[in-house]
Amino acid sequence: MKTGNLFNTVALVGRSNTPGIAEPLATLAACIAKRGFEVVFEGDTAREIGISGYPALTPAEIGARADVAVVLGGDGTMLGIGRQLAPYRTPLIGINHGRLGFITDIAAADMQALVPVMLSGKFEREERSLLEARIVRDGEPIYHALAFNDVVVNRSGFSGMVELRASVDGRYMYNQRSDGLIVATPTGSTAYALSSAGPILHPQLQGIVLVPIAPHALSNRPIVLPDDSKIAIQIVGGRDVNVNFDMQSFTALELNDTIEVRRSKHTVPFLHPIGYSYYATLRKKLHWNEHASNEDDKAS
């Protein structure tokens, strides 16, 4: 059905294995459908909550058919569907039904008021970058993955430090003994990288940050690189080393394996309500400015 709006078909994606998510998803679907939009569900979401009356699609089918995806869940849900829809440039709207909610910025209590307004074309749009990584073993690529937040090379919980050789654009950077190394996007700079004393990168900054995890030498500090950098991390020493992609998929590594990381050609459009402020998100999520303030988020 044509609505005369920027969007016609809206996909709904929900957080897996979450008690109480069926009712808000059904409510949101009805709220959107009665305004003339076609509503489809991500297949696993539809099966899990037992909803009928709407098409149930794979992520690839959503990418080909939907104009926008509304995600109800936590940051992990947003990361997972974002990676799958990245090749299709499907815009995402995030509704927080998790704990932290750095990138799912709409409160569930506000979704019926805000989402229809956004679907009518009133929103703020930004592009979020991704990383692509491949593992090379004996000169041959053996694994490839996208990451929205970060690519993390780290040891298992029962092994000692690992030694990693890092180079950038073919130039040697250092050998580092540590618990691992994080390669993060600006979006991922407020995830694992932040807990390892990495800097916060504004999402619109074109950069990639390398953050050591518990390095043996305190002089091994985080460094922000240009986002067109090509990063190579070789496993020089250690055992039980893994590489994780957004902490949602991983593979075991062997000595002399190399992880090659670069910015992906794909970006994911995030849609926010009018008046969205990244700094307000930081204040709320990181508990900045705990004392009352008369300041607001209006541009001066």
UniProtKB/Swiss-Prot annotation:
Chief location bin: cytoplasm
One biological process term in Gene Ontology: NADP biosynthetic process
Which residue ranges does UniProt annotate as crossing the membrane? none
Question: Catalysed reaction per UniProt?
Answer: NAD(+) + ATP = ADP + NADP(+) + H(+)
Entry annotation: catalytic residues: 75 (proton acceptor)
Cofactor(s) needed: a divalent metal cation
Q: Where does NAD(+) bind?
A: 75-76, 149-150, 177, 179, 190-195, 214, 248
Question: Where in the cell is the protein located?
Answer: Cytoplasm
Q: What GO cellular component is one of the record's annotations?
A: cytoplasm
Give the EC number(s) under which this enzyme is classified: 2.7.1.23
* InterPro entries in alphabetical order: ATP-NAD_kinase_N, ATP-NAD_kinase_PpnK-typ_C, NAD/diacylglycerol_kinase_sf, NADK
Under the GO molecular function aspect, what terms does this record hold? ATP binding; metal ion binding; NAD binding; NAD+ kinase activity
The job of this chain, per UniProt, is described as: Involved in the regulation of the intracellular balance of NAD and NADP, and is a key enzyme in the biosynthesis of NADP. Catalyzes specifically the phosphorylation on 2'-hydroxyl of the adenosine moiety of NAD to yield NADP.
Q: Which family does it belong to?
A: Belongs to the NAD kinase family.
What is the protein's name according to its record?
Answer: NAD kinase
Primary gene name: nadK
